[in-house]
Amino acid sequence: MFSFEKNSLKNTDKEIFDAIELEVKRQHEHVELIASENYASPAVMEAQGSQLTNKYAEGYHGKRYYGGCEFVDIAEKLAIERAQQLFGVDYANVQPHSGSQANAAVYNAVLKPGDTVLGMDLGAGGHLTHGSKVNFSGKIYNSIQYGLDENGDIDYEQVAQLAKEHKPKMIIAGFSAFSGIINWQKFREIADSVDAVLMADIAHVAGLVAAGVYPNPFPYVYVATTTTHKTLRGPRGGLILCNNNPELAKKFQSAIFPGIQGGPLMHVIAAKAVAFKEALEPSFVDYQKQVLKNAKAMEKVLKQRGINIISGGTSNHLLLLDITNTGFSGKEAEAALGRANITVNKNSIPNDPRSPFVTSGLRIGSPAITTRGFKEKECELVANLLADVVFNCGDEKVENETAAKVLDLCDKLPVYK
């Protein structure tokens, strides 16, 4: 028998307790600019930390291989219904443990090993699971990669040419570091021309799509995958969506279970349901609109400070910065900004001469700081502070002065009250 007091984390494992406390402190004291990160609400975290973690529930709601699933069934059913409502679709699978798992399931459902897949090149802003040679998607399947044109937009002419030449079975429209807007209709026209399945990976923009401030990939795509954190502000997890295609939906269902997963994480699914409910509130639309405004505010200042932005700017929540002209690498800038209490990630830029472990760029985004309550004024300040550090990496005085300003800003707008 457990006692919530006697068997608390603090009493049971002081090392892990202290590590968590330090991370809580870091989140409070640092400005979070990593585009793929966000802050989950107390309600989401409460659901994820619940006793639902104890329940095994192989199968799907109403069709389990274990007894005692009547209450976790409620959680999964709510998560599915809310996801369907949020994205306007008739099928949602809430069981994928991650976005990569969701993508792997789609591959398994519609392709055979060796089939050709056309996706965005990692160096141009794509994701590992879009055909990178170091990933399963580039090892099991014949991966062909497209990139950006001279204006920093997706090179649709190249996509069409590669599709015509290689006849892919599936085309992936999506990204990990692209600040533009995807033309779903154009992708569908190209996919139809070679009879390919069109998949959208909306992991980065799912919240924007749900709020109606970024184009919805439906009805143009056969299937969409996403993570449930990032702009959706839920727990870390994955999601598969499709509409008006029961045959494909059946394949996705079996591709997850028993295809690549066993027991679902019911505590995470409950947390997803909570996040979807929050995203259905009118305030979520206001939040996503502010995400876009804040990204634009940072864009304006960074351009004024002489930092080059790939694609010329941003039309979503993220900015990919080319910092070559600063004389410092992405690795150096990431470390310097970290010392100044600004968290970013180094990122390759198109045709980057440096390795992915060093890079010539930084990727930043506005979702987390917007959740924190930052508006345009604060984002302009943050962009100026970022520029101060990036042009002076290693300058202890600049880094310390910046850290002090960041701490003051963070104290005024805490993540959790």
Swiss-Prot record:
The keyword Coiled coil does not apply. CDD domains: SHMT. It catalyses: (6R)-5,10-methylene-5,6,7,8-tetrahydrofolate + glycine + H2O = (6S)-5,6,7,8-tetrahydrofolate + L-serine. Its cofactor is pyridoxal 5'-phosphate. It is found in: Cytoplasm. SUPFAM superfamilies: PLP-dependent transferases (SSF53383). GO terms for cellular component: cytosol. Pfam families: SHMT (PF00464). Its EC number is 2.1.2.1. The modification N6-(pyridoxal phosphate)lysine is found at K230. GO terms for biological process: glycine biosynthetic process from serine; tetrahydrofolate interconversion. GO terms for molecular function: glycine hydroxymethyltransferase activity; pyridoxal phosphate binding. The keyword Repeat does not apply. It comes from the Bacteria. (6S)-5,6,7,8-tetrahydrofolate binds at L122, G126, H127, L128, S355, P356, F357. InterPro entries: PyrdxlP-dep_Trfase, PyrdxlP-dep_Trfase_major, PyrdxlP-dep_Trfase_small, Ser_HO-MeTrfase, Ser_HO-MeTrfase-like, Ser_HO-MeTrfase_PLP_BS, SHMT-like_dom. Keywords: Amino-acid biosynthesis, Cytoplasm, One-carbon metabolism, Pyridoxal phosphate, Transferase. Belongs to the SHMT family. Homodimer. Catalyzes the reversible interconversion of serine and glycine with tetrahydrofolate (THF) serving as the one-carbon carrier. This reaction serves as the major source of one-carbon groups required for the biosynthesis of purines, thymidylate, methionine, and other important biomolecules. Also exhibits THF-independent aldolase activity toward beta-hydroxyamino acids, producing glycine and aldehydes, via a retro-aldol mechanism. This is Serine hydroxymethyltransferase.
